[in-house]
């Protein structure tokens, strides 16, 4: 490989690293909401999986504790899936053209 090609690859890698850092910062600001029980339980989190809010409809507080725990878990899982999908969508443009294996998830 010639020096010019190597320098070009290094510059491209550095630019991608800077872009990834910016995208990571943006993902920390994007919020998604997961729901369960027809919206009676909601979990709001960032695309970096930081939970911001948990909302439980007061009508559930008198109900079965086990059911409420299941609804909270389901809402959390829904939020995680939405955060992952949003992150993949946002990162997709940055990784197009890279020979990444199928199912490879970014950010790392």
Curated annotation (Swiss-Prot):
An example Gene Ontology CC term for this record: cytosol
Gene3D superfamilies, per database record: Nucleoid-associated protein YbaB-like domain
Name of a matching Pfam family: YbaB_DNA_bd
Bias (Pro residues) ranges: 99-108
Keywords associated with the record: Cytoplasm, DNA-binding
Keyword Transmembrane helix: no
Major location (coarse): cytoplasm
Single GO molecular function: DNA binding
Region described as Disordered: 87-108
Superkingdom of this protein's organism: Bacteria
Subcellular location, record wording: Cytoplasm, Nucleoid
Record flagged with keyword Cytoplasm: yes
PANTHER family given in the database record: NUCLEOID-ASSOCIATED PROTEIN YBAB (PTHR33449:SF1)
Subunit field text: Homodimer.
Family indicated by similarity: Belongs to the YbaB/EbfC family.
Role played: Binds to DNA and alters its conformation. May be involved in regulation of gene expression, nucleoid organization and DNA protection.
Name of the molecule in the record: Nucleoid-associated protein Bxeno_A2072
Species, as recorded: Paraburkholderia xenovorans (strain LB400)
Phylogenetic placement of the source organism: Bacteria, Pseudomonadati, Pseudomonadota, Betaproteobacteria, Burkholderiales
């Amino acid at each position: 490989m010639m020096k010019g090609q190597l320098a070009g690859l290094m510059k491209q890698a550095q630019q991608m690293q800077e872009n990834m850092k910016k995208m990571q910062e943006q993902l920390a600001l994007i919020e998604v909401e997961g729901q369960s029980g027809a919206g009676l339980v909601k979990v709001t989190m960032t695309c970096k999986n930081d939970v911001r809010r948990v909302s439980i409809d007061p009508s559930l507080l008198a109900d079965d504790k086990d059911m409420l725990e299941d609804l909270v878990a389901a809402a959390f899982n829904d939020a995680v899936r939405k955060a992952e999908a949003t992150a993949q969508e946002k990162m997709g443009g940055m990784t197009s053209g890279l020979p990444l294996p199928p199912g490879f998830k970014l950010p790392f």
